[in-house]
Amino acid sequence: MLTVKQIEAAKPKEKPYRLLDGNGLYLYVPVSGKKVWQLRYKIDGKEKILTVGKYPLMTLQEARDKAWTARKDISVGIDPVKAKKASSNNNSFSAIYKEWYEHKKQVWSVGYATELAKMFDDDILPIIGGLEIQDIEPMQLLEVIRRFEDRGAMERANKARRRCGEVFRYAIVTGRAKYNPAPDLADAMKGYRKKNFPFLPADQIPAFNKALATFSGSIVSLIATKVLRYTALRTKELRSMLWKNVDFENRIITIDASVMKGRKIHVVPMSDQVVELLTTLSSITKPVSEFVFAGRNDKKKPICENAVLLVIKQIGYEGLESGHGFRHEFSTIMNEHEWPADAIEVQLAHANGGSVRGIYNHAQYLDKRREMMQWWADWLDEKVE
């Protein structure tokens, strides 16, 4: 392997020459003396050379790092020379994605557009963004999907496949691709399907309460789990909760329309239990984050999407209970006790347009929901072994 001293000592000769570093990486020294890092590699049976960077602008370690990244791409069938060429024109996946995104975001909420952009920026574009879109093979797109599957994010994996498919279709109709590999990947994915989430029958709730009382992990995750049960919110709605939208005086939480499934503001009355929990939490996360349930390592983000599931797993209820299961239990028990169906549906944010006679802003139903949610919180607390 090369050393810095060898590189600095390399002088131009009558003919160009190479100083080998290893694994295909070498320093090319032309007659002019302007040294260049290059990587020799083979793909699809053909030998190619990638110009990695110029010395001394790119150090030895930087060249090794870039060569390592290129070799990793090669191992999954990505040609770094083609990727470099594609990144400089408007036929790369990244360039076409940006066109598609600008076209589509006009009909999306700001929150959804931001969430989708983050998914592409974090997990998709770093892998295939620099490739000519017409050269992307199914295996290369599958490599992207595997990133989600490997961390258990099956729903996001399917979402990524569908949205990538839309980018390919956009490329096809604009004359820059002829084939969309996304639909063909469905059979290769790890069995994603819409499923019924686990929930507990009423007679098992006391045992769950007892187990939850033994949890000794993150206080933020524990309070998140309890608030999720008391409010019957969706996990996404809970995670997005901001301190500015928690009104202790009027005892309501407002969930922004951008994160709601129905794209409407959701007003949630707070029971005594929720007020107490959020008051406790305010001394922990409010000084350091806008998020009520701030992440452990990055206070600029909320807790991870699996935080509540991890609590459930730790207390021994994996596969038996879930965040969505809390909502099912709330709906079942409240209907069994003959609370107004409309009030239950509004609390679950199932209301859509005029489906419950426009009662989102009806004071009577907010008052009824205050009463209902206090009854629900008390009912849960009474279920002890």
From Swiss-Prot:
InterPro entries: CB (IPR044068), DNA_brk_join_enz (IPR011010), Integrase-like_cat_sf (IPR013762), Integrase_catalytic (IPR002104), Integrase_DNA-bd_sf (IPR038488), Integrase_DNA_bind_dom (IPR025166), Integrase_recombinase_N (IPR010998), Phage_int_M (IPR053876). The active site is at R234, K261, H324, R327, H350, Y360. Keywords: DNA integration, DNA recombination, DNA-binding, Viral genome integration, Virus entry into host cell. The keyword Ribosomal protein does not apply. Residues 91-172 form the Core-binding (CB) domain. One of its GO terms (biological process) is symbiont entry into host cell. It comes from the Bacteria. Pfam families: Arm-DNA-bind_3, Phage_int_M, Phage_integrase. PROSITE patterns: CB, TYR_RECOMBINASE. Residues 195-373 form the Tyr recombinase domain. GO terms for molecular function: identical protein binding; prophage integrase activity; sequence-specific DNA binding. Integrase is necessary for integration of the phage into the host genome by site-specific recombination. In conjunction with excisionase, integrase is also necessary for excision of the prophage from the host genome. Belongs to the 'phage' integrase family. This is Prophage integrase IntS. The gene is intS.
